[in-house]
Amino acid sequence: MNSSSNIIYKSFKNSKIFLNKQCIINNGLKLNKKYFTTTSTKENNNNNNNKNPKFIENNLFQKGLLTIGSAFVAFINPGRGDMVATLGEMTGGCAIKSMKQKMMLDPIGRQLLKEKPRIKESTYPLNIHLLPSTTFGGAYYRWMKEHGYSPDERTEVTLIQDEDDAYVMQRYREVHDFWHVLAGVRPDFQGEVAIKWFEFLQTGLPMNAIGSIIGPLRCSWNERNELINHMIPWAIKSSKSCVYLMNVKYEDHWEDDLNEFRAKLNFIPYKYLSDINQNKTTTINM
């Protein structure tokens, strides 16, 4: 990173306005709302009937500030999950509507929208830690523990007003780790870029398109080589072959054999080149 970029980054790092969406909403440049409202009073009254209870009111200026600020910080530091989440909420509009429409056309999707189940540690089955690693639930549990993740850490959706739209985004965040397990893709930077390609083709979310295009530029040469020549083609093929994954109630499949569950979904897992080469070497030495 050059000196000018360092100066910009440090200024953003020290700025609560750009690094904290709550601060932008509550304190960010208190402009007269009548010049920046995005919906009419009539529309607001209609939306209140199906309003996300966690929604934080924001105006047009604040939306722009959040979008630009979160995009900049997420690019500089992809590890900032809160900024990545904010960017997703700010840019997801049409894609989220399309995702919801696909769910409404499917019986399981409609059930999910109606019941709005959450993926939390408190909703895990009591025996999940006892499930074999060959099962979907057992593989998921061990994958989460191995990488130190918890579904409880997923950011709550607060910038999408419609309750169903907000749930679609929340559900997408919470099933992200399921897709990693089904894909057999590691959660390192290279793996996340590959999953972003897969997710963009499944969901159409602009945030994933941005990550899938810019991501390879941040990879090493070797990582980029496997990513471009193998992982991205896999993501394209697998995303097209499998069912629409937002219409899957994963909670009903904890005890399913992982490979059988993949087959049921027509999900093609990824095989790393290192694993393929290792298997070839083992076979030759036998």
UniProtKB/Swiss-Prot annotation:
| Location relative to the cell | Mitochondrion inner membrane
Provide one Gene Ontology biological process annotation: ubiquinone biosynthetic process
List the pathway annotation.
Cofactor biosynthesis; ubiquinone biosynthesis
Query: Which metal ions or organic cofactors does this protein require, according to UniProt?
Result: Zn(2+)
The EC number(s) this enzyme carries = 4.1.1.130
Bilayer disposition of the protein: Peripheral membrane protein
Q: Which reactions does this protein catalyse? A: a 4-hydroxy-3-methoxy-5-(all-trans-polyprenyl)benzoate + H(+) = a 2-methoxy-6-(all-trans-polyprenyl)phenol + CO2
Q: What class of enzyme is it?
A: lyase
Q: Name one Pfam family in it.
A: Coq4
Gene Ontology CC annotations of this record:
extrinsic component of mitochondrial inner membrane; mitochondrial inner membrane; mitochondrion
Q: Which residues bind Zn(2+)?
A: H176, D177, H180, E192
Keywords assigned by UniProt, alphabetized: Lyase, Membrane, Metal-binding, Mitochondrion, Mitochondrion inner membrane, Ubiquinone biosynthesis, Zinc
* Something else known: This protein may be expected to contain an N-terminal transit peptide but none has been predicted.
Can you tell me which family this protein belongs to? Belongs to the COQ4 family.
Q: What does this protein do?
A: Lyase that catalyzes the C1-decarboxylation of 4-hydroxy-3-methoxy-5-(all-trans-polyprenyl)benzoic acid into 2-methoxy-6-(all-trans-polyprenyl)phenol during ubiquinone biosynthesis.
Subunit: Component of a multi-subunit COQ enzyme complex.
Entry-linked PANTHER family: UBIQUINONE BIOSYNTHESIS PROTEIN (PTHR12922), UBIQUINONE BIOSYNTHESIS PROTEIN COQ4 HOMOLOG, MITOCHONDRIAL (PTHR12922:SF7)
Write down what this protein is called.
Ubiquinone biosynthesis protein COQ4 homolog, mitochondrial
Provide the species name.
Dictyostelium discoideum
What gene, per UniProt, encodes this protein?
Answer: coq4
